[in-house]
């Protein structure tokens, strides 16, 4: 008999009423009495489970009543509508086959577990409601972002994980080497000789796909990357991880205004798509994780995003009379408290802050005419502060070279990046969205470790 997905039972209920069906899945809960019992069966295809009713007509009734949680079974039975009951339908079992037994020490028993504890069993946590919802939404949101760009003719570029360049110029990168740590090759100066390493030079895990994406934008016009990035920051916070995913579009013949428009369109599209395609999961988050999630998302979807320059924002903050922990003066990098004040108290909606001081932004951002600020923007949203950072890239070769030298970086490390300006360079712009930060925003999950299947953080690389 053909297997039916639980998702199909929920989406096409009328089609199955009074029909014989077969479902397979794992036992989430089991209650029994002497003559009948109930199984809550989840097959992974849908957030909700299906109720199986079984009784002593089954030859293996007693064996079924003793099954531990998470045992896998195959059930054949009649699909019955139950409109007056708690659940809309159930399956009256005529046959239950055991596919795989679970041990009685299965750690996810029928009680509440803390997220901290569930991180220690990350291989099992997707079986819980919270993480089933989280990682299905992660999948749907990722698809929505791809769909957004593909519908607009963007080319998806697979940028390298192993790189010889540091996009941010911050130096907090993971080294990639095949050197024997107990027998490092040394040069005449006593330093490690990287020419003897696998790639013949120092290489690292990428912190961003932006620079290679720029190369492809100057051939395909509109491109995007969506892949893992790595930061060797020793930050043990709820918002930092050593491995995370970035969405990075790059558009040619474009300025800062264009990239802000693209940012707003993408964010609204992805949120609408998730609300439409994961209603059960979003209802769960809004009820059990963060009761403001749906209100927050609808605020973003239905708002025209505000725009204000950094200089204007500093003035607004200084004149606000608010008691900030971090003093406000021109030149500071805005802290979360400042960002949230602007988006929550001043604009009451998402807002782009533009034209930041050059000293707090990356080398590749286009210098403004004032020589003090760059064509950069951060999107601030109510609830968390900064969500997305973008900029117009510096297309003028001489200005870019001066900036690289000013920051003490090696011009030769960026030879190919500079050549993009040499051979038909043009104005172009892009942004970066930390995918996990976006997921935290739309789910209400408060820790980045809980929106990545197997988080990598300082001192932790289990699984």
Swiss-Prot record:
Pfam families per UniProt: tRNA-synt_2, tRNA_anti-codon
Reactions performed catalytically: tRNA(Asn) + L-asparagine + ATP = L-asparaginyl-tRNA(Asn) + AMP + diphosphate + H(+)
Main location: cytoplasm
Cellular component, GO, one term: cytoplasm
Keyword Membrane: no
GO function terms (MF aspect): asparagine-tRNA ligase activity; ATP binding; catalytic activity, acting on a protein; nucleic acid binding; transferase activity
Entries under PROSITE patterns matching the protein: AA_TRNA_LIGASE_II (PS50862)
Gene Ontology biological process terms in this record: asparaginyl-tRNA aminoacylation
EC number: 6.1.1.22
Localization in the cell: Cytoplasm
Keywords associated with the record: Aminoacyl-tRNA synthetase, ATP-binding, Cytoplasm, Ligase, Nucleotide-binding, Protein biosynthesis
Enzyme class name: ligase
Family indicated by similarity: Belongs to the class-II aminoacyl-tRNA synthetase family.
Assembly information from the UniProt record: Homodimer.
Name the UniProt record assigns to this protein: Asparagine--tRNA ligase
Species name: Bacillus cytotoxicus (strain DSM 22905 / CIP 110041 / 391-98 / NVH 391-98)
Gene: asnS
